[in-house]
Regions:
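Cytosolic regulatory modules rich in charged/polar residues
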Residues: 1-103, 209-237, 249-251, 255-265
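Transmembrane alpha-helix detector for multi-pass membrane proteins
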Residues: 59-78, 93-169, 173-174, 179-185, ...
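Hydrophobic alpha-helical transmembrane segments of membrane transport and translocation systems
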Residues: 151, 156-272
């Protein structure tokens, strides 16, 4: 995390661990909400920060659900789509020898391979391989009638959504879950899609970080008292964020003090554990 992000975590009552000769700081406890926030959110105004966070949440959800939802709808539940859209999907697939599941898996694995190759290659060459390679492979696959143009657009948009997640490690977990959702949706349709979402949601609700629910502040409202929701998907104005999160609320709940708009940080001793 960035230095200002680590400093903000200390002010919120979290612990920050530093390892010798490493530029990475470990913040505990952490929640899913922290992986979708950036330090820049606190430099921008409320509307801009809230809009950026909303985009990240939507992108994170679509990064692992969009291919599975496409397979469930086009293979099992075509009646929920308008007729012109269904005809466009089937016209795009004319001449493709593989089932839609194989098409999606082929393109997803190709994009994952290009992404991994781009990370390992140095500097500008890695970015060039990721962008140009994706365009060339996608266009070549469409020209050879191996995949439909709809699948190429779908996979490219899914990859774009994963790039919108601030934490690369957090985005990697969504990339893994994406394949599980694809298999379940291709097997059971919309029911498999919902089952996979339910299993993921139950697993996240069961996780804890240092004794605190991983999905705070969306769960555990009895702990947060409704205050931590002000800094979740919607970031309230900074003058409203005067209370520290639940991690430090036992001894000192007030982060800001002052009259009217004259807010300053309290002078407190911060101990780095």
């Amino acid at each position: 995390t960035r230095p200002d992000g680590a400093a903000n975590a200390l002010l919120e009552g979290r612990g920050v661990g530093l390892c010798d000769k490493s530029q990475i700081a470990i913040i505990l406890p952490t929640t899913m909400n922290n992986f979708l926030k950036t330090a820049d959110d606190y430099y921008n105004r409320t509307i801009a920060a809230s809009f950026a966070r909303l985009i990240r949440y939507v992108a994170a959800f679509m990064s692992f659900t969009l291919p599975g939802l496409y397979l469930a709808v086009t293979n099992f539940h075509t009646q929920i789509l308008p007729t012109p859209l269904i005809l466009a999907f089937y016209e795009a697939r004319l001449g493709c020898p593989f089932p839609q599941l194989i098409e999606v898996l082929m393109m997803e694995l190709s994009f994952e391979l290009l992404r991994e190759a781009g990370i390992r290659l140095p500097g500008a060459m890695g970015n060039t391989i990721g962008i140009v390679g994706g365009l060339i492979i996608g266009q070549a696959a469409v020209d050879a009638n191996l995949v439909s143009p709809i699948v190429v657009i779908l996979v490219a948009f899914t990859a774009l959504c994963s790039f919108a997640i601030p934490s690369e490690e957090f985005a990697f977990s969504f990339r893994i879950l994406k394949f599980a959702v694809i298999i379940m949706s291709a097997w059971l349709g919309y029911f498999g899609f919902l089952i996979s979402l339910m299993v993921i949601l139950l697993h996240l609700a069961k996780l804890k970080s240092c004794g605190y629910p991983y999905m705070m502040p969306f769960v555990g409202s009895e702990l947060t008292g409704g205050e931590d929701e002000k800094d979740s998907i919607i970031r309230f104005p900074l003058r409203r964020l005067w209370r520290r999160p639940v991690f430090a609320r036992v001894k000192e709940c007030r982060k800001l003090k002052g009259n009217n708009d004259d807010y300053i940080y309290e002078n407190k001793l911060i101990v780095l554990l």
